[in-house]
Amino acid sequence: MSGVSELLLPSPVPQGVEGVLHGLHGRWRGRAAHRRRLMQLAEQAERRCMALLGLPETQLQQQLLEIQSRFRRRLLTDDETLLAGVALVGELAWRAVQKRPYRVQFMGALAMHRGWLAEMATGEGKTLTVAVAAVLAGWSGRACHVISANDYLTERDAQQMTPLYEACGVTVASGGGALSPEERQLCYKADVVYVTAKTLLADYLRDQLATRQGAGRAQQGFAQWLTGGAQQPSAMMLGRGLHTVIIDEADSVLIDEAVTPLILAAPQKIPGMHGAVMWAAEVAERLHEEEDYTADRRTRQIQLLEGANQLMAAMAWRLDAVWRSEVRRQELVRHALSVRHFIRVGQHYLVQEDKVVLLDDATGRMTPERSLTAGLHQAIEAYEGVPLTDPNASMGQMSFQTFFRRFHRFCGTTGTARESTRELWRIYRLAVLPIPTHRPRQTVVHPTRVYATLEDKWQAVAAEVAQVHASGRPVLVGVRSVSSSEQLAAVLVEKGLSAQVLNARNHAEEAAIVSRAGQSGHVTIATNMAGRGTDIGLEEQTRSLGGLHVIIAECNSSARIDRQLAGRCGRQGDPGSVVTLLCLEEDVLRQQLSPALLGIARSLPRWGWAAGVLAGLVHYAQRRSEAQAYGQRRAVMQGDEWLNNALPF
């Protein structure tokens, strides 16, 4: 990415009176008048698109060349040019991928082109909408990055829309998967690049690191080249700068993933660390809860008691001198105990080919590029008995909040933005604009049911699956972790029911499992992998039976993620239904509610007014969790701002 991007440094988040005025500006950006104006433009674009239906290919290409020239001269063009361009892309979409944008898709593309976050309900065709907006940006001749929630969606969307981009004279590439530096450099030369936020930010940090390291050598080499003594220096940057970014599933990227900064790191060998980690694992095995230490599962804190301190002191002679201090000993043992009490295989990580691979809680996917810091990753490896890796040393870091505010043009779309409207405007200056649905939604939402124990809940889920399965309708059950998906599958087998399981263990079968999930009588259990971007098509027989039935069997820390799962049914006006079946042993309830409050909840009946109270407790716990996550995101951004202010000095 070129040094030009460095000129656009993000301004601080408005505070005080400036913050109040900024908030009023955000309300103005989201007012209904803007929606009405964009809907009028979308109606005009739809009519103009239909007028191109019988236009010969030669005339269509002439119009394409003329429109491209106009956009290259001025991206934020007048309404006439914009409507002509959008209508042309719509007709080319029909000829290239047999999809003609609906009016609401035109509206979404226009909203993104004008810098809004278009909130489009799940199933409304965001993939095509994003592509229309990306073509307009690509015509400008400046770099456009389309951010997807994961590598699967990156590859899928780029592949599906490639014929449209080619028809519009725009080059496209996908930055997902494992690419060599040369392949990645070539990828970033395309007009439109589909890539995940983590990959793009990591490449940006690598560019900055390479620039700093090579500054002196570059000056010397450039001088030699000018005098004919050396070849022209090769481009170090992976891209053409930070100009336009379009974020699909924007709340996942800007909210869920922004809790921690992205750290570019490299393994660093620390003498004696592996031995110290194994020593701590042995000490932890000898300790007894309540006698030697306490483990608070609500706050996830370990407190070492006198018995633990005595055992550590007695065994300290086996440590290298640098690890013998009381502070270091206690940190090592706390990590070892945390692994045993708070970090669970199948929920937080998997063991694959003798390696610990972390799982993303929001997406349910494996993240082999990630590792835990401060020796915690090595503590997990010691507990699982796999070879210990070296800890990573930070080479550079940046928050997503800081990174995305460096783009000149910033827009996106998602189906679940309303809960985060204020934060999206306050941090990113990104106003949310709701887009109406193409057809009225027919989803039936049943009341939430909350059970006392996990076993009671699994039995209720099995009974619900059996009842709906008997009618011939397909069922999708959403859970949070790999272990929960496998546990529920075993319960269904005991009831004589079989189910396809989609989780991080069998991610390679994702496309095949999703393709069958809408078939009559099919039962699918899925982690959050199926929560975003998953289009479950229905057979005609399935529609006549009532469509897909979604069971939310575990609540997430944010209600937005639950709504994403619910959105797998009732897409494009299809019939469907949703029910939420939970228990008082959900992680978010245990972390956010006091033991006394949970005790009172267990004494309540499961019907009538009490059922509403229990459902209200779930929403209360989720709101508390979301508030904590916002505090973390704010702290991350403040840390970035402090670094930006301190490092120049």
UniProtKB/Swiss-Prot annotation:
One cellular component term from this protein's GO annotations in UniProt: plasma membrane
Record-level Gene Ontology MF annotations: ATP binding; protein-exporting ATPase activity
SMART domains xref list: SecA_DEAD, SecA_PP_bind
Reactions listed under catalytic activity: ATP + H2O + cellular proteinSide 1 = ADP + phosphate + cellular proteinSide 2
Gene Ontology BP, a term: protein targeting
Principal location: membrane
The name this protein goes by in its record: Protein translocase subunit SecA 2
